[in-house]
A protein has these predicted regions:
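Tandem CBS (Bateman) regulatory domains
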Residues: 1-13, 52-85, 91-100, 115, ...
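The conserved cystathionine-beta-synthase
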Residues: 17-34, 41, 86-103, 110, ...
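A glycine-centered beta-loop-beta connector
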Residues: 30, 38-54, 99, 107-123
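A generic helix-loop boundary/linker signal
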Residues: 16, 20, 46, 65-68
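Short, charge-rich amphipathic segments
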Residues: 25-36, 54-62
């Protein structure tokens, strides 16, 4: 069975967030696109972090609880800056194993520091089932 590369399976235009966006803008992007998180990309296309819906919810609830305006917080303040990523030519099955081991639902795909796409569990599941179907 031939293993696909990440490039063959990844999305090349994932929803991304701007590090300067406020938490309400980030929440709206997450809700409108029905996703659970997104990579944070600067104006040069460089991956600078990731934000989950839990990060956003935590920022809003914490601000409200403390009597502060939750709209003041920026994505850059609540994002996870240490991001696991892979390259477009990596093997899908190996990346899937890493994602499972680290309990991650999505993986940014980066080449020369620039975000090229994103790989999700659903895309991997589709690719693996297609490989099995083709082998039968």
């Amino acid at each position: 069975m031939k293993m696909a590369s990440v490039r063959d399976v990844m999305s090349t235009s994932p929803v991304t967030l701007d590090p300067d966006a406020n938490v309400y803008e980030a929440a709206n992007t997450i809700l409108v696109n029905r996703i659970s998180g997104a990579p944070v990309v600067d104006t040069d296309g460089k991956l600078v972090g990731v934000v989950s819906e839990l990060d956003i919810l935590n920022a809003i609830v914490t601000s409200v609880y403390n009597g502060a305006d939750p709209g003041i917080a920026r994505v850059s303040e609540i994002m996870t800056a240490e991001v696991e990523s892979n390259a477009p030519d990596d093997d899908v099955v190996s990346v899937a194993r890493e994602m499972l081991d680290n309990k991650r639902r999505r993986r940014p795909i980066v080449e020369d520091g620039v975000m090229k796409g994103q790989l999700t569990c659903r895309q991997i599941l589709r690719a693996v089932t297609d490989m099995v179907d083709d082998a039968q």
